């Protein structure tokens, strides 16, 4: 991983799904929506003063959201923070930094 650069897109792992699940309540509060389906499809990561995860989430038939989650370094107090999101995405929309 190059510090500051985004990795190539990779299929979501169990760990990435767990990260997505942990910030789901933050996203639902910001979008004023409830997501019955919330499946991580793929992700990219970026090393900063911690790690940014860009995760493509499927929320229904051909409905996708891109989320950005910051995971702080182990010695810092907060662990996972939803720092951005993009709605109205499709399966083919590429994950990009935002």
UniProtKB/Swiss-Prot annotation:
GO terms for cellular component: cytosol. It is found in: Cytoplasm. CDD domains: CY. Gene3D superfamilies: 3.10.450.10. Its main location: cytoplasm. This is an intracellular thiol proteinase inhibitor. The record marks 4 as: Reactive site. GO terms for molecular function: cysteine-type endopeptidase inhibitor activity. Signal peptide: none annotated. This is Cystatin-A. A motif (Secondary area of contact) lies at residues 46-50. Keywords: Acetylation, Cytoplasm, Protease inhibitor, Thiol protease inhibitor. It holds the Pfam family Cystatin. Belongs to the cystatin family. PROSITE patterns: CYSTATIN. InterPro entries: Cystatin_dom, Cystatin_sf, Prot_inh_cystat_CS, Prot_inh_stefin. The modification N-acetylmethionine is found at residue 1. The keyword Acetylation applies. It comes from the Eukaryota. SUPFAM superfamilies: Cystatin/monellin (SSF54403). The keyword Nucleotide-binding does not apply.
